[in-house]
């Protein structure tokens, strides 16, 4: 069992801070804990040569390649820039991720 904790979750809006897609933003599609990676919608696109299978035609397909989790930061809609986050505990005991700059919650 993997006990890795990531600062991003599926569905979060993130900004890339390193690599060929630096300063671009996108939505997290999938978390890959074994590779310490995240798939971000429309970013880090690569071309794959796919063989025809069944009724699916073959050809060159563009798809997302994983980015290392250290190369993405949460994007705050209120601040309009990538920010670090911290954990706050609410009165009911629930933990939420909060923007360090403005205090806006990422967990709605």
Swiss-Prot record:
GO terms assigned for molecular function: rRNA binding; structural constituent of ribosome
GO annotation (BP), single: translation
Tagged with keyword NAD: no
Transmembrane regions listed in the UniProt entry: none
Cellular-component GO terms for this entry: ribonucleoprotein complex; ribosome
Domain of life: Bacteria
InterPro entries attached to this UniProt entry: KOW, Rib_uL2_dom2, Ribosomal_uL24, Ribosomal_uL24_KOW, Translation_prot_SH3-like_sf
SUPFAM superfamilies, A to Z: Translation proteins SH3-like domain
Keywords annotated in UniProt: Ribonucleoprotein, Ribosomal protein, RNA-binding, rRNA-binding
Coiled-coil blocks: none
Self-association state and partner proteins as the record states: Part of the 50S ribosomal subunit.
Similarity remark: Belongs to the universal ribosomal protein uL24 family.
Functional description taken from the UniProt entry: One of two assembly initiator proteins, it binds directly to the 5'-end of the 23S rRNA, where it nucleates assembly of the 50S subunit.
Name listed for the protein in its UniProt record: Large ribosomal subunit protein uL24
Organism (species): Geobacter metallireducens (strain ATCC 53774 / DSM 7210 / GS-15)
Lineage per the UniProt record: Bacteria, Pseudomonadati, Thermodesulfobacteriota, Desulfuromonadia, Geobacterales
């Amino acid at each position: 069992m993997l006990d890795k904790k990531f600062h991003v979750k599926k569905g979060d809006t993130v900004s890339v801070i390193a690599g060929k897609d630096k300063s671009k933003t996108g939505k997290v599609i999938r978390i890959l804990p074994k590779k310490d990676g995240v798939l971000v919608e429309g970013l880090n696109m690569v071309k794959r040569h796919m063989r025809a299978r069944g009724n699916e035609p073959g050809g060159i397909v563009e798809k997302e390649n994983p980015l290392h989790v250290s190369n993405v930061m949460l994007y705050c809609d209120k601040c309009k820039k990538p920010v670090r986050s911290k954990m706050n505990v609410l009165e009911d005991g629930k933990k939420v991720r909060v923007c360090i700059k403005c205090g806006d919650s990422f967990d709605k």
